Amino acid sequence: MLKVSNKGVIRRLSLRSLRASRTRNIIAVLAVALTTVLFTALFTIAMSINEGFQQSNFRQCGGWSHGTFKYLTEEQFEQLKDEPMISEWGLRRFVGMPTGEAFSKSHVELGYSDANQAHWMFCDPVEGRLPLEGSDEAATDLHVLELLGIEPRLGARFTLTFDVDGRETTQSFSLCGWWEYDEAVVANHVLIPRSRAEAIYDQVGLVPGQAADGMTGTWNLDVMFKNALHIERDVRQVLANHGYQDENPAESNYIATGVNWGYTGAQLADSLDPGTALAVAAVLLLIIFTGYLIIYNVFQISVTNDIRFYGMLKTIGTTPAQLRRIISLQALLLSLIGIPLGLLCGLSLIHI
């Protein structure tokens, strides 16, 4: 049997059949587009809900850095911050907490945070800026200013009495910036320069690393990895790369760590058991299969309307394989128009 090259003929038949049924094709394209809009909206809304949930979690956690290496010495901090696995890092050094009746119902922390750390803790000034090194400046939120009875004005002077590892001290500061108060955030912060924090340690006689609470004056390294899928695993790998561990506090190479539980992807990846994985896969397959059935039924109705045309083609010798190719080409062309149109419409509607 001779093999005849008839791909061009099949293409022309498919295109001419489409041109002969313009109204039907417009309806088919609209059906595909509307189905695509439906699923675009579904997935985008799901992602928006997840993002809102994460943001709420971050505020409860106190920030959105991936993980934390806690209570480090300066040497440990210098070692870990240059780890290639870490894409960004931020430094935080705790100084103390304000005392007095005004602060009895508020959790306020005074300390140094670099620009990255301040950003991750939602401490981005809406007026002014973060404090400069070598100055007596401080930045805080509007709630702390309200507790102090201070009007939010750049350059305003205020005095704060606070506890530094059991030693009370009173210090004066110049307001250099402030940000809005967020009730969802657990802790309020008063940020001061690193030089001022170290000066306060010296004034109260605190030697970093020898604080009674084990926390004041230490270096806390908050980090961001390339992604948030396996935060706990990545934190432990960083420790292992430098000969440390976070499981046995009795060992000399122990470093305390924290993992940001606000990331839903990390929670899912770290606790994903076979049953959960199957359930997630089943839901995704169901959604995809539902979309396939909707579009398939639209094309099935279109093909049924042309049954006489395909019968005539079969009578004159067109094989079933060739008929399938004609129908597949039509489906492909209509999908190439309908799916991008649906994606554009879906994304446009969501951003209105």
Please give the residue ranges for each predicted region.
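Short amphipathic alpha-helical coupling elements at transmembrane boundaries
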Residues: R16-A20, Q54-F58, M312-T315
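Alpha-helical transmembrane segments
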Residues: R24-I26, L34-G62, Q300
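Basic-flanked hydrophobic alpha-helices used for secretion and membrane insertion
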Residues: M47, E51-Q267
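Interfacial "coupling" helices/loops that link adjacent transmembrane helices in transporter permeases
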Residues: L293-L334
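N-terminal Sec/SRP start-transfer signal
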Residues: M1-F39, S328, L332
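Conserved small/polar residues in nucleotide/adenosyl-binding loops
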Residues: H351-I352
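Hydrophobic positions within alpha-helical transmembrane segments of bacterial inner-membrane proteins
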Residues: T36, G291-Y292, N297, A331, ...
